[in-house]
């Protein structure tokens, strides 16, 4: 699958309103000191299980393993019940994306805006 956005793309962000499940957002990942552009997969009340890199949303499989996350990954099995201030983000190219499977849920305060369109 081809990436939707590439490093260096200029994106127009909507910075008001609350992003919804399915929206593509730009979020700052403090632990890694960079901004990611990912889709919101889960919101408040959703239950996420990550097992061997596969992601299950409320019990249904929605994503395949990220390269290098299968088998002995230290994040082999995680469970999240999302609180009102959290999102679980997933990349469009799920086989290679570094997303919430790698860095966990993100707080709503980390979201810089919802992507409206790519300008350049």
Regions found by a protein language model. Name each.
Residues 1-120:
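Extended hydrophobic leader/signal-anchor segments used for secretion and membrane insertion
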